[in-house]
Amino acid sequence: NPKNIAVFGGRDAEIVISQCKKMGFKGEIWPVNPKRKEINGIRCFSSVRDLPEGPDASFIAVPRLPAIEIVKELNAMKAGGGVCYTAGFREVGKEGEKLEKELLDNVGDFALIGPNCYGMINYVNKIALWPFDHGGEFPGFGAAIITQSGMLSNDLSTSRRSMPFAYMISAGNQSVLSL
């Protein structure tokens, strides 16, 4: 149950913040963007180093090279874990494979979902590290769904005819945490 989340990026960060607010997340949200003063009315930090402490959870939606550096810095801060939404790793070929290895070499103890994934929704604790509008609400029970596919998990999250969900994870490349 994260007390705080750091959100790295621009437009996708805005959506994650909106989704967390919509769900009723009560913890602190720390947007990180060196080019913006605020996102969704919340003051931005310029870098990982400017955060007050290692965040409990993070959402990373920046280009590949900065994503690797962010993961390295979050690991050094003993941050809890996070989602790397960033694509362009091994799914794009040899160059991406090298970058994914570099990501892995820097992840350390940082629990990472992805890269190249939609993220996770925790309906129980009201947190959505997920860059899309989603449906669903937590009625006190529900299934946990883990998929490799972002599109499948997104379709399930917006369906009003299926069973309720407690947790939803799109695992993407599964570089660190795997199915």
Which residue ranges define each predicted feature?
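Catalytic-core regions of core metabolic enzymes
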Residues: N1-L179
